[in-house]
Amino acid sequence: MPSFDIVSEITLHEVRNAVENANRVLTTRYDFRGVEAIIELNEKNESIKLTTESEFQLEQLIEMLISACVKRGIEHSSLDIPTDAEHHGKLYSKEIKLKQGIETEIAKKITKLIKDAKIKVQTQIQGDQVRVTGKSRDDLQATIQLIKTAELGQPFQFNNFRD
């Protein structure tokens, strides 16, 4: 029976490149001259920490990072950006988490979405991915289109397609 997996993965190498590009832009920006501003990637925690002297500059750093990520093929929705900034002394900071894998709650939403569409496929939640199995390729392709058009707050990739 044909099957495929729905996953949500970010290549950390591309994230590292995006952070380096954002840092390069940061050094050339006139409004950040003489300002303590840092964009750093923590690969162990899968997070990006932004630090600067004011909240406005922090928002500018976020825009630079998002722009660099989009240029590297990383979708904006794969970044979990907190709404409020932490304030330590004269510095403001935000820690942006990278969304890796599909959480159980979102996997259940995907399963419910597919069942509500009445496509003749079966879904299985397997850790941080969802396996979809069906009798025909057309049903699987209809499922892929359904997931691509759904707004679930996270980008998805489809891999391990078997016939």
From Swiss-Prot:
Entry keyword set: Nucleotide-binding
Highest taxon of source: Bacteria
A cellular-component GO term for this protein: cytosol
Pfam family, one: DUF520
Magnesium among keywords: no
InterPro entries named in the record: DUF520, UPF0234-like_C, UPF0234_N, YajQ-like_sf
GO molecular function: nucleotide binding
SUPFAM superfamilies listed in its UniProt record: YajQ-like (SSF89963)
Record bears the keyword Nucleotide-binding: yes
Family: Belongs to the YajQ family.
Protein's job: Nucleotide-binding protein.
Protein name, UniProt field: Nucleotide-binding protein HD_0358
Organism: Haemophilus ducreyi (strain 35000HP / ATCC 700724)
